[in-house]
Amino acid sequence: MEQLTECESIRDEIKEKLRQHFDGKIVRKDLTKKIKEGANVPVYVLEFLLGQYCSSDDEEVIESGVQTVKRILADNFVRPDEAQKILSKLRQKGSHTVIDMITVHLDIKRNCFFASFSNLGLTNVPIEDEYPEKYDRLLCGGIWCIVQLDYEYVEEEKQNGYPIQIRKLTPIQMPHIDIADLKQGRKAFSKEEWIDILLRSIGMEPDALSYREKWLLLTRMIPLVENNFNLCELGPRSTGKSHLYKEISPNSILVSGGQTTVANLFYNMGRKTVGLVGLWDCVAFDEVAGIRFKDKDGIQIMKDYMASGSFARGKEEKAASASMVFVGNINQSVDVLLKTSSLFDPFPPEMGTDTAFLDRMHCYLPGWEIPKFRPEHFTNDYGFISDYLAEFIRELRKEQYGDAIDRYFRLGKNLNQRDTIAVRRMVDGYLKLVYPDGEFTKEQLEEVLQLALEMRRRVKEQLKKLGGMEFYDVNFSYIDMDDMSEHYVSVPEQGGGKLIPEGMCNPGQVYTASQGKSGMIGVFRLESQMFPGNGKFERTGIGTDRDA
């Protein structure tokens, strides 16, 4: 009971700090769930309205605000199939207020701005210069707005005039983000409080998670905050692997498993248009087992892009900054996969056994360590409005903290160039998320460095299984510059950081030193297992080599 009271007092303290430093940018997440069930609007639009009308502890004010938001959505939200009905109403009444996605472009020939309405289907609607100057996101992909429209048809101007005019435009997404305000606001919170706020902002309840589980969920956010970051997460079903990329961020896209093309993903040579990697901050592939390229060179182009952030199509090379995320399900236990194949086994064969492709993965997130989500894992408390979270994360993509490692540590000799890049990008991502103000101690940096080394080592361990002694250097470490002591980082599922675990081996296990095919001496673990069968003795081999 005392522990429950303590949790509530900590929550109240965080809530008061949020109100003080981020007023109008926070929302109670259970209100989003209530209205979202009956309203087909993006979460970030809904939460912005709730943040405006329901930012109070008074239940009456909250209830009144919820009713106001429902009324605004019912009266003004434009459904694409009702566009003509809305236009007819506008013509009859002479004015009408709509909620729609507005994009503005500059017509250089006529030297003026014009607006396009996504659901209403209107294009080239004249708009005053003050709006794109004040709300620059109108020019960068568009934002959702409440717009008061006037309709006035003048017979004399029917050739050149436009009967629909914009009287007033009010954004219902964050029109612009001041990153300095965020950094200043962060100083009011401890590390633990800030992590809890970030998790509540994506809908999760941190009190139902262990400390390590919190960090694993934060790892999912690194592709949103880091350019050209490649993440893989394989794990059980119902752990929310794709939720963040589909529902929370308006800057990421989830490509469901199935066939895709180079034109769709990278560059369409017929239309001369850049594909998904040029339009989104993060491209996530759901159900990796089903990924298929219609083009023979698809995987090769993807490998090129994952390594360098650019790809060649036709006569020129194109660059993009989108991160790549691969999520999928593991159908067997991790122990079985480690014994019989690799942790990349769910990938299609052309990817899952291609060491050049897998070596480009910066991070392997152990999805099996994240719990299956139940109702108590979803928060009813305050967090950032989804749009505010997504936009400040997007702004942080421009910051760089990866060189912070060099202040206190040096990476060990077993890390090659790709390993170093992967670890630096991961550390950069963690620091941006948890310490956006750039203020952290040596111990806090060491914590994220250890996690980054573990995530990359998990990739390297599987490469060693698939590629043999080419990838023998998996004993990742870092050196403390103060006393020059070297610290090794292991992966939990491999059974600790020692080459041969201490104590008695498991039944059927023995360790031996011998020469491999390349002539290099290594330590081998031999296992014998017994299954029901016909008494025949079979060798399963080492990794993919059944004859070993």
Please provide the spans of the model-predicted regions:
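Conserved nucleotide-sensing/catalytic segment adjacent to the nucleotide-binding pocket
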Residues: 268-316
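Conserved P-loop NTPase/AAA+ ATPase motor core
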Residues: 491-548
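Extended, charged/polar low-complexity intrinsically disordered regions
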Residues: 2-201
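Structural recognition of the conserved hydrophobic beta-strand(s) that form the central parallel beta-sheet
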Residues: 233, 284-286, 320-340, 363-364
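Conserved NTP phosphate-binding and transfer environment spanning the P-loop NTPase/kinase superfamily
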Residues: 52, 362-492
